[in-house]
């Protein structure tokens, strides 16, 4: 047996240590995970209630077309039902896009550092990955990304807000880019953290789909909606584009539980508003801490912050781990002296910041 040569350069995704494993290893009773940008307030109670009926139907396959969720989401977004594609998390939509458009005779353009699954899936398909460095402020350099496009370019990825910096692409920048990018090139706008955005110049992207048939938007129920365990993501695009990539989607790829919970979660926008309000207050806690200690903290439009501590990130990560706080070391994210920290509850933020103050 011979595996693809380009697959040998990849490593499996390494998730953070589970809470129970950290408790056992360090003899801790309490461990707080602020590493994976999960919602510290959980999910809507309505979503939990929606699972009760579906739990009795586990012997039955889910609706492979996600019809009920499709109808509800299309109304929420004011788009046609045929403009949607669903995935086992938005990660699967990324995989579907790469399956559909990339091979060893093509290339794809992405920022760096950014969400790693764009590159990971492109490499699996054998495509060349052209990585364009972020600007000093942590945002995408769209002019440089545009210059990297050639006749073999199939897909350009824009992560906005960007993971791991939390920065975003403004409306003016995005529109200027879309006007200049060749119409034959697919532009994927990953908006996993869309619900957390409060910037006034952030673009309303869904209406742009009527003008740009080469634009695709990715969103998820894993972050603000708090349904990470159920893995429901979706893509929005021109219905012809959706029709073309649907054959690359696996059958029954979103569960009965996920579909039911997502529908209920959409109906509880008050929960989302509450989470965003508390998240904004939490962000300010970190901004104040960074200012007090003279640290660089990227302004974030997400539920996480990236702070440069000017010392090896792995050392800080380990020190926090031993105290019962799991964060994300920037060493694996392209920021070797920074930590990416999920915004927790007010109390969680206070506790971890107090520990960091002691360490500093």
From Swiss-Prot:
Molecular function per GO: histidinol-phosphate transaminase activity; pyridoxal phosphate binding
Reaction it catalyzes: L-histidinol phosphate + 2-oxoglutarate = 3-(imidazol-4-yl)-2-oxopropyl phosphate + L-glutamate
EC id: 2.6.1.9
Top-level taxon in the UniProt lineage: Bacteria
Pathway(s) where this gene product acts: Amino-acid biosynthesis; L-histidine biosynthesis; L-histidine from 5-phospho-alpha-D-ribose 1-diphosphate: step 7/9
Top-level enzyme category: transferase
Gene Ontology process terms (BP): L-histidine biosynthetic process
Residues modified to N6-(pyridoxal phosphate)lysine: 223
SUPFAM superfamilies (alphabetical): PLP-dependent transferases (SSF53383)
InterPro entries documented for this protein: Aminotrans_II_pyridoxalP_BS, Aminotransferase_I/II_large, HisP_aminotrans, HistidinolP_aminotransfase, PyrdxlP-dep_Trfase, PyrdxlP-dep_Trfase_major, PyrdxlP-dep_Trfase_small
UniProt entry keywords in alphabetical sequence: Amino-acid biosynthesis, Aminotransferase, Histidine biosynthesis, Pyridoxal phosphate, Transferase
Essential cofactor(s): pyridoxal 5'-phosphate
NCBIfam families xrefs: hisC
Assembly, per entry: Homodimer.
HAMAP family attached to this UniProt entry: HisC_aminotrans_2
PANTHER family assigned to the protein according to its UniProt record, in alphabetical order: HISTIDINOL-PHOSPHATE AMINOTRANSFERASE (PTHR43643:SF3), HISTIDINOL-PHOSPHATE AMINOTRANSFERASE 2 (PTHR43643)
Family: Belongs to the class-II pyridoxal-phosphate-dependent aminotransferase family. Histidinol-phosphate aminotransferase subfamily.
Protein name, per record: Histidinol-phosphate aminotransferase
Organism: Bacillus subtilis (strain 168)
Gene that encodes it: hisC
